[in-house]
């Protein structure tokens, strides 16, 4: 990658970081309207979480899924690249196994094969280089570990396009307007075998829930 492309990618990521910094204090209240969607994601995940698991969550926001699911596992490392989002999450009471920290999903500090599962919810589509995050997820997952990657996708109705336009007008950069087949192909190209997927949400904000495992027979995007 040229220095110019690297600089552009970092600039775009900074733009979205500034967006989340601005919205951190009111993000939790705003997400109350999305409670049914978070509940649906949690319902899909729960059968695959067990008490001995160590889980990494990327792009946790202020903990919408962290608090709900962390009680089901031994250790839950919830991370976000927005310091203000993490500060908001830390204001809430939490169990001993739930930890919050500021981390960059494309450059994680953890050793190889550390986690039994990784969750990244509603984030890959707003990353300028989501393949880097996917490569890091692949690296830190234990053999046989699981990736949970619910992500907003691009629907086929005009309302979806209006939603994305509204988000861009608010200052959030959307880099990948995947349809469901394109999103699943992206995960597969990154070295993951998709085990199941489901379309959640509504026609305004369709979300593709995907559960995948590392496919060690394939070459990942690095």
Which residues does each predicted region cover?
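Conserved class I S-adenosyl-L-methionine
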Residues: 2-50, 64, 68, 88, 148-170, ...
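Class I SAM-dependent methyltransferase SAM/SAH-binding core
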Residues: 56-107
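A short acidic, Gly/Pro-enriched loop at the edge of an enzyme's catalytic core
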Residues: 106-117
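A short SAM/SAH-binding and catalytic strip from SAM-dependent methyltransferases
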Residues: 117-129
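A short glycine-rich, Lys/Arg-flanked "PGG" loop and its adjoining helix->strand segment in the class I
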Residues: 131-143
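Short alpha-helix
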Residues: 175-190
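Core SAM-dependent methyltransferase catalytic element
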Residues: 190-192, 196-222
């Amino acid at each position: 990658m040229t220095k110019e492309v690297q600089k552009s990618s970092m600039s775009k990521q900074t733009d979205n970081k500034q967006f989340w910094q601005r919205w951190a204090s009111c993000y939790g209240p705003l997400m109350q309207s999305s409670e049914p969607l978070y509940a649906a994601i949690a319902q899909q995940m729960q059968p695959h979480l067990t008490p001995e698991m160590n889980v990494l969550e990327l792009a946790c926001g202020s903990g919408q899924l962290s608090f709900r699911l962390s009680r089901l596992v031994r250790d839950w490392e919830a991370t976000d690249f927005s310091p203000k989002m993490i500060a908001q999450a830390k204001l809430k009471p939490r169990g001993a196994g739930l930890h919050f920290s500021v981390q960059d999903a494309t450059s994680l500090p953890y050793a190889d094969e550390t986690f039994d599962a990784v969750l990244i919810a509603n984030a890959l589509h707003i990353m300028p280089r989501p393949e880097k995050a996917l490569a890091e997820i692949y690296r830190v997952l234990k053999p046989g570990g699981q990736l949970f990657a619910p992500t907003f996708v691009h629907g086929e109705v005009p309302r979806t396009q209006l939603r994305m336009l509204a988000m861009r007008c608010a200052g959030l950069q959307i880099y990948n307007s995947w349809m469901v087949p394109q999103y699943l192909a992206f995960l597969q190209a990154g070295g993951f075998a998709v085990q199941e997927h489901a379309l959640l949400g509504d026609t305004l904000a369709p979300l593709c829930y995907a559960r995948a495992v590392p496919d060690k027979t394939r070459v990942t995007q690095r």
